[in-house]
Each structure stands twice: as C-alpha cells, then as structure tokens.
Amino acid sequence: MKLSQPLSIFAILAASTVAVAVPQDDACAQCLTEGTFCEGFAGPVGTCCDGLVCENAPGVADDAHCIRKKKCLAKGETCVSIAGPVGTCCTGKCTFVAPDYSVCK
C-alpha cells in the first residue's frame, strides 16, 4: 500500500501538469486555410481565415471549402479574354469589344 500512494500522487501531479501545459483556447481559435473543408450536411466545422469564404463549388452541395473571396471587376477591366470568362463586373455589364475580348462598362 505504501508504494501505491506515492504512485497515485505522481500520476495526479503529472496529469495536472499536462493539462496546464496544453492551452485549450488556441485550438479553438485557429482558422481554416484555403482549400480546407468547412461545411457539409452536418453543419460548419470551423471558420475560414481572413480573405477566405466558405462556399460550395458550382453544382456541388454539402461539400463547402474555404476559397478566396471573389472581387468584382472595375470599369475598364477585362471580363472575357481568349482564355474565357475572367470575372464578374461590379456594374454587371460586360461589353463586347472584339472577338474573345470584353470589358466592364
């Protein structure tokens, strides 16, 4: 019995030291990085880091990932190029200029 009492005290001391050494708040405060799964049918699993939003890919449901926030294109910026659509105009008006080239008006 004498050996088990010091062993129990040591176990309690070791457990309390580990509990104090591991900060719990930091684990909850970490944000999700680009490309990380963030929300599904069961709900959100975290918060995306600054500059990212949690969105599903077009045509996909219940499988959202953190992606960069989409910015609209200002007047005069190219909205369609030879490579295809570049983005959405802030005004909503993408005007044809030449084949495979349109700008925001």
Swiss-Prot record:
This chain's protein is named: Secreted effector protein PINE1
Provide the protein's localization. Secreted
> Where is the major localization of this protein?
secreted
Q: So which residues are the signal peptide here?
A: 1-21
The entry describes its oligomerization and partners as: Interacts with Arabidopsis thaliana PGIP1.
Going by the entry's taxonomy, the superkingdom of the source organism is recorded as Eukaryota
Q: List the disulfide bonds.
A: none
Q: What residue ranges are annotated as transmembrane?
A: none
Q: Which organism is it from?
A: Sclerotinia sclerotiorum (strain ATCC 18683 / 1980 / Ss-1)
| GO CC annotation | extracellular region
Function, please?
Effector protein required for full virulence. Directly interacts with and functionally inactivates PG-inhibiting proteins (PGIPs). PGIPs are a defense mechanism of infected plants, that inhibit the plant pathogens secreted polygalacturonases (PGs) used to degrade the plant cell wall. Excerts its function by interacting with host PGIPs to negate their polygalacturonase-inhibiting function via enhanced dissociation of PGIPs from PGs.
Q: Which key words tag this protein in UniProt?
A: Secreted, Signal
